Amino acid sequence: MNLHQFRFVQEAVRRNLNLTEAAKALHTSQPGVSKAIIELEEELGIEIFARHGKRIKRVTEPGAQVLKSIEVILREVNNLKRIGEQLSLIHI
């Protein structure tokens, strides 16, 4: 489980479940995004997204709960980065 996987899930939802668009927005490949999301699902033991074949159709109910946690985690990571930047300016 890592922050890249969290960002991929978040961006996939932002891009209306279009992994190609999510990959473009994150400057990476669509197969990489797809693989990372599947690996996260396997690690968590749930399906974040309902699929029809290879196409993502919707966020599952457990996926919605995971997404809420992902959003909190990524928001806190950004807060930590901001704190680090502010403190590094003070110590220069």
Where are these regions (language model features)?
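DNA major-groove recognition helices of helix-turn-helix
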Residues: 9, 39-40
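Short helix-boundary/capping micro-motifs
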Residues: 12-27
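A short LG(V/I)-centered, amphipathic sequence patch enriched
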Residues: 41-59
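Alpha-helical linker/hinge and terminal dimerization helices associated
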Residues: 43-44, 66-88
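Conserved small/polar residues in nucleotide/adenosyl-binding loops
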Residues: 90-92
